C-alpha cells in the first residue's frame, strides 16, 4: 500500500513538473505591435477576439 502511494505521488509529481516545464513567454500578453511580443519567431501580436478589445501575443 505504501509503495503504491509513493509511486502515485512520484508519477503525479513528474506530470506536474512536465506541465510546468513549458513557461509561456509569449501567450496572452497585451501588445501594440510585433516588437512587444518576446519569445520565438512565431510569437506575433494578434487582433482581439471575442469580447476582449486588446491585442495579445500568441504563437498560433
From Swiss-Prot:
Expression (tissue specificity): Expressed in salivary glands.
Entry keyword Cell inner membrane: no
Keywords carried by this UniProt record: Disulfide bond, Hemostasis impairing toxin, Platelet aggregation inhibiting toxin, Secreted, Signal, Toxin
N-terminal signal peptide: 1-21
Any GO molecular function: toxin activity
Major localisation: secreted
GO terms for cellular component: extracellular region
Post-translational modification: Contains 3 disulfide bonds.
Annotated transmembrane regions: none
Residue span of motif Cell attachment site: 49-51
Subcellular location field: Secreted
Keyword Disulfide bond: yes
Function description: Tick salivary platelet aggregation inhibitor that plays an important part in the anti-hemostatic strategy of ticks. Inhibits platelet aggregation induced by ADP, thrombin and thromboxane A2 (TXA2). Blocks platelet adhesion to soluble collagen (most probably through the binding to alpha-2/beta-1 integrin (ITGA2/ITGB1)) and binds to purified glycoprotein IIb/IIIa (ITGA2B/ITGB3) in a dose-dependent manner. In vivo, reduces thrombus weight effectively in a rat arteriovenous shunt model and inhibits thrombosis in a carrageenan-induced mouse tail thrombosis model.
UniProt similarity note: Belongs to the ixodegrin family.
Name of this protein: Ixodegrin-Ip
Classification of source organism: Eukaryota, Metazoa, Ecdysozoa, Arthropoda, Chelicerata
Amino acid at each position: 500500500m505504501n509503495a503504491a502511494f509513493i509511486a502515485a505521488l512520484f508519477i503525479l509529481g513528474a506530470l506536474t513538473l512536465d506541465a510546468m516545464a513549458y513557461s509561456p513567454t509569449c501567450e496572452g500578453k497585451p501588445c501594440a505591435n510585433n516588437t512587444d511580443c518576446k519569445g520565438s519567431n512565431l510569437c506575433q501580436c494578434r487582433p482581439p477576439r471575442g469580447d476582449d478589445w486588446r491585442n495579445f501575443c500568441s504563437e498560433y
